Amino acid sequence: MNPFNHNYFLGYINEVTPQFVKVHFPSSNLLEKFSHKGVFYAGGNVGNFVVIEGEEFGFLARLIELELPDGERKTISEKAIQHDETAFHPSGKAELLLSFSVFEPEKTQKTVSKYPAIGAKVYSCSDEQIEIYVKEFGKKQDEAENVYADLGKLTSNDANCKVSLNSVFGRHCAIVGTTGGGKSWTVAKLVDEVVSKTNNKVILIDATGEYSKLTSNSLTLGTDAYFPYQNLSIPDLFYLLRPTGQSQRPVLLESIRSLKVVRIAKAENSELAINTKQKAEKEKLKFYTFYQNHIRDIEDNTCNFDITFLIEQIKEECVYPSGYTNNLQDPKKWGGYDAKTYDYQTSLVGRIADLINTEIFNKLLGFKGAPAGCSSIVEGINKFITQNDEQILRISFENIPSSFSVKEITANALASFLLNLARHNTFRTNPLILFVDEAHQFLNKNIKDEFFESQTLDAFDLIAKECRKYGMFLCLATQMPRDIPIGTLSQMGTFIVHRLINELDKKSIESAASSANRAALSFLPILGEGEALLVGVDFPMPLLVKINEPDKKPESNTPKLKAKQAIPITNKISDIKK
């Protein structure tokens, strides 16, 4: 590959700054498109790539501005442009993107401290050369690790954009853009590429059901699947019950411990095996001895107990800390019933009763046993991970209402379950990619108790911060990047940015994606449907890409308004006669 052929010549560098260079074009004819030896070159129009020749390093740049000198603007005409090659001398501004070795043009690096000299020659860049550079982004030394996805074509010159899947997902990925910009197609395309190019598995959280045609291996929460409450973590249960910190939370925790003791005792046929653990006027020794012997199972941070007895157990926990023996205070046994402590629990008891008896929560969490016709989503995920016949699992939230924060809490519980699997190295040898569509519905959500103390649902945030090294990669798709927690957004190594209009959204991307400079972000409001700006840690320069159609398209088409049908005159006359 020889990028510095005189047949590709465009002009000379006449000004150099840390951000851009200015180019002098000896003739306006040099800006036109041309072909050489069957290879198409885009010339020197705005948005096109050019290469700049240096002594040791060459430079790839993108033209972002063209203009004529003031003295030549008044004489411009169609005839003068076409027939007088020396009448016009345009100048342009080009953004420096990356540098490469003159002796090994395939090896690229980011432009930091190297700049072209005044008088350096500028050449048009071929599609082939751009394809080679893009393919080098994120390339690993081990060839077996280099898995490439046919993501789309560059908008400037239709060069194929084959990017490394390890570069896209290795440090998590975010797909952002306003509605109708093409996010759903991009998600579907990435899923297609992962499934067709690798043996890795994909879990897709589908908020609206638009990906139903992507795979037949689907679980719809609230319809044919439920999340067993026994797999909730204690914090997840607290999100649902919202206990107050000082008066209700300690009693609730003790109630949960007691019910876990009851469950384990039943399994061992112990004398403690009753439905609720009675404490009033009872000896403490047997309980604490049993507790110490099974402390690992009891303090496992799960809700593996019979929640239908929780209200009764809360009342049993409302006792004085010490009892009496022969009219003397005895710390070895609990005291009698404490009505004042129980009064503080009445609002909590009411919330528990509402939770257990609410139909939607029973369908989702199975408080009264597995709902009819529903399978456990935990068993479904475990089966999906351990068996090799399926690569995609779609988990649909389309039938879950937004009331009571049930959608956010259930998604957070599901993310906590996957986070726990990742922490146990389930995905280290065979990484899993977790796609979250409409991520703004699940992330950056807070739950408030009756005293308006806020608790953050942070499972997805923890996945973004922890799970890269465990082999679980997160891919978020959202309309509003400003609604994603800044801690989560800053962990994203790759951004695929569709059309963005809101200034706050653009600033959130600019602050999170270091390589997305102002010149690249200026294209965001005018991007067409399916066009996106690809930026990331492993991409030395931003890429404007037209995403290819996915094999299985999501149901994201906008319903069309239809023209009103004219009423036939004969029908009008018959109506008058009636």
Name each region found by the language model.
Residues 1-176, 190, 428-430, 445-448, ...:
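Basic- and hydrophobic-enriched, low-structure N-terminal and domain-boundary segments
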Residues 146-227, 486, 508-509, 534, ...:
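Glycine-rich phosphate-binding loop of nucleotide-binding enzymes
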Residues 199-203, 389-392, 429-433, 470-475:
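Loop/turn-to-beta-strand initiation segments
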Residues 207, 211, 233, 432, ...:
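Helical "lid/switch" subdomain of P-loop NTPase nucleotide-binding domains
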Residues 213-215, 229-234, 239-459:
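P-loop NTPase motor domains
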Residues 238-244, 456-457, 461-546:
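Conserved ATP-driven motor cores of ASCE-family P-loop NTPases powering translocation/secretion/packaging/pilus
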Residues 252-274, 523-552:
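Conserved AAA+ ATPase small/helical "lid" subdomain
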Residues 302, 313, 320-322, 529-578:
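Conserved P-loop NTPase motor module
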